[in-house]
């Protein structure tokens, strides 16, 4: 995927510059429409709950001491274009954004079609927020499972798991084990 490789390269260049200049916070211009495109792309890939809600406002960049922040996630693209035109009198157009060879462009166009069918921004945002709430509930039960049903022996560097550790839903067990790894 050319766009994914280009994005990874951009992130890497930005992260390297941040590291050179001791910058701890990198603000990106992702907006609400980007969030929805990403959500649908993840559905097409068959992502689980974590994948569907992975586009968060604040994340660490690959374990480094760099915080990636997306302060514009609540704004629609049309609002940002309006602000750009009114305040800066211009905005940069990326020709790949209209190139149908790219999945993201096709998904973006699908979103326009779905909007005509009644899937508006408010409903998509509500769906994503509901999924985030579900994820928070799962995290709560994962933490509870780890606290009640796991002991870490430092001297031997091993985990002891009780029988009850596995007496949970598949997702709780999976995420609990993932946290231990």
Describe every region a protein language model picked out.
Residues 1-110:
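Core alpha/beta nucleotide-donor-binding catalytic domains of modification enzymes
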Residues 9-10, 59-65, 126-181:
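AMP-forming adenylation/ATP pyrophosphatase catalytic core
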Residues 37-38, 104-108, 122-125, 170-178:
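Non-catalytic, well-ordered alpha-helical scaffold segments
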Residues 45, 49, 77, 117-119, ...:
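Alpha-helix boundary/capping and short turn/kink residues
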Residues 90-93, 119-124, 138:
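Short, structured loop/turn "capping" segments at alpha-beta junctions
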Residues 97-105, 122-133:
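Internal, active-site/partner-interface "lid" segment
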Residues 109-121:
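Conserved anion/nucleotide-ligand pocket segment
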